[in-house]
Amino acid sequence: MGKRIIGPHEDLTRRIIAAALAVHNRLGPGHKEEVYQHGMEVQSLHDGLAFAAQKMFEVFDNGVLVGYYIPDFVYEEEVITEIKAFAALPQRYLGQVITYLNHTGLKVGLLINFGARRLQVRRVFPSRQAAKYPVQYTWLFIPDWLRVERAAHPPSGPRGCA
């Protein structure tokens, strides 16, 4: 029998997976991604998991803000979690979570697919090459009300790196 490798934040990832299983058992497959995201919010609150939904991470290029990474959830400032709802999970979403990890400096992510008959969960770790590059990104949580205001009035000109 193969030996299971214990990853970073093992207890937390198990609790997140347990929450996802509870949501999937109640709702089953076939819903839109947003339904599962809301279900995870409700279940995570019920289970006492601290999380930020749709947390925005600024991305800079040569000191200029060029965009944001917006993972579905960041649990306890430690685990990035992406929710999907596909019958079969496309491989490109694994790369999305790896990119989030590489650029935030977090050590583990979860890619959870609710769309299949059975819940699909992948624990994801940053690429080894990410350690070569210093993290040059600022973590920024922007409330929903401010995001709407910023979208209505986009920034003009270059912005400095924090």
Kindly give the residue locations of the regions a language model identified.
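Nucleic-acid nuclease catalytic cores
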Residues: 80, 84-132
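Histidine-centered active-site/metal-ligand motif
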Residues: 24, 31, 93
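Interdomain/boundary linker segments immediately adjacent to catalytic/signaling cores
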Residues: 1-27
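Active-site metal-binding core of divalent-cation-utilizing nuclease and nuclease-like domains
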Residues: 29-78, 86, 116-129, 138-143, ...
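Extreme N-terminal tail/first-helix region
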Residues: 1-11, 134, 141-152, 157-158
